[in-house]
Curated annotation (Swiss-Prot):
GO biological process: tRNA methylation; tRNA wobble uridine modification
Family: Belongs to the MnmG family.
Protein name: tRNA uridine 5-carboxymethylaminomethyl modification enzyme MnmG
PANTHER family (alphabetical): GLUCOSE INHIBITED DIVISION PROTEIN A (PTHR11806), PROTEIN MTO1 HOMOLOG, MITOCHONDRIAL (PTHR11806:SF0)
PROSITE patterns: GIDA_1, GIDA_2
Organism: Actinobacillus pleuropneumoniae serotype 7 (strain AP76)
Coiled coil: none
SMART domains according to UniProt: GIDA_assoc_3
Amino acid sequence: MIYHEIYDVIVVGGGHAGTEAALAPARMGLKTLLLTHNIDTLGQMSCNPAIGGIGKGHLVKEIDAMGGLMAIAIDQAGIQFRTLNSSKGPAVRATRAQADRVLYRQAVRTALENQPNLDIFQQEVVDILVENNRAVGAVTKMRLTFKARSVVLTAGTFLAGKIHIGLDNYAGGRAGDPAATMLADRLRDLNLRIDRLKTGTPPRLDARTINFDVLAKQHGDAELPVMSFMGSVDLHPRQIPCYITHTNEQTHDLIRNSLDRSPMYTGVIEGIGPRYCPSIEDKVMRFSDRNSHQIYLEPEGLSTIEVYPNGISTSLPFDVQMGIVNSMKGLEKTRIIKPGYAIEYDYFDPRDLKPTLETKAIEGLFFAGQINGTTGYEEAAAQGLLAGINAALQVQGKEAWFPTRDLAYTGVLVDDLCTLGTKEPYRVFTSRAEYRLLLREDNADIRLTPIAHELGLIDDARWARFNQKMENIEREHERLKQIWIHPQSEHLAVVNELVNSPLTREASGEDLLRRPEVTYDKLTQVAAFAPALDDKQAAEQVEISIKYQGYIEHQQNEIERHKRHENTLIPAEFDYDKVESLSNEVRAKLMQHRPVSIGQASRISGITPAAISILLVNLKKQGMLKRGEL
């Protein structure tokens, strides 16, 4: 049976990628359908109950700057907020929030159900409908076919998912949910490279059986940060602490003595796991010189007894898991509510994607999330947003859009994936971004909100708030430029208390703020420079832009130099075999990756600057040398 209504965009999967992928085209005015195997698990946090962190918080801010949901949802569901790296420079500061799983899921579902132009339908998808090499719909398990002009697939860990606990395993997409086996089989028939990855999760603990009195507490920040540019502390629910315990030699001995029952160490699991979120088995074996590992006990919500022990992800048998838990301080009598497990799943080689996340093999088919080889809610959501935007733009007949590496962490993520691919679950770090001083959390809206407005992604309220902020920044810059302190000023004594060396000549407010020891808050406490802006976001921008002006300008100049060739396009029909001066190895790599620009080509492993120079010469010889927006 064919459903009577034809959609502009169909999104398959209701996780973190799927929700953003569905909301984006709906906000742009396109008729969108979200297909999910279970409406009750929309926005489900399958692993750790937290949003944000180093690099990840930057992605959340970018999603929010473009009208996405994740930041608003965590502001409504966060039960502990912290700013990480708060003592370091603004480029690496990151917001992290512990989440109440139920509140987060409720916030996501409410947003989806109240979004105009968006329909939700509960059914497992078993096939992507492809006609004339173009995705035109999806087929459900009850043989109901939905037609659409583009399709976004966000299947997470469900494609041929296999759950491992000890040497036992069974099909599953995550604990309690079935694997998408039929869809995985169908996708293997398409012209796409597929491999396997693995991830894992720790056992969940019963809070009533934990001795919190002997454990160290970890509170959130006294001055609570917010995640969304439109957010407020008033949105936050009650805040609660986390707790800290540690593994010990008894724990490690138990793990080492149980490796013959580990699916990873006996070769049962073939997929590669996330490097930066290793299992406790991996940590014990890889860091054998350490006699202890720190474990964070994170409450899963305000209305549940479940506790997430961050740091002991494991696929060891249940009896070993019990031993691991009970070997730690404060957990001697703790009961496990849910066992930890590892899950293997299919993922697609992201080098087979365009930077828009459309597959190169099938028009109108977009991939987002863990099926592209990433790990993390934030990475998934950022991809979902981008895929949803481009699915909509394609339907509208408009030019595709994606952020470059100097514009957003989302751009770094997508460029790394599409250019280099990945053999292990990929996560974002600030260290992956060469222009991180420009890609800060605090300026994500300045970088991306005007683009979002042009694309039709944000509402009038957000646009008005953004413009008011920009006006406040401009006015405050001008005000601080105009206020001067001279050696005879009545305010000199107060100013000299702020600075390390007394003033010997006149200085403006901007001059003083450039000094490392002077903050905006301290400066505006001086009567001459009062009052401070009420708009805290604008005040932060004023301080950062003044204090780091020289570094920012240097990085902008570096970007301009790089861009001279970054956006030089390589035509799809360019024949590398005719470039005889390239080595066979370089030619093979270029033909395999088919980079769309010189910038992409330069980031392929083994492509030297000399090879790039040869490419440029040959493009010019053949009259193909042109720059443009990708």
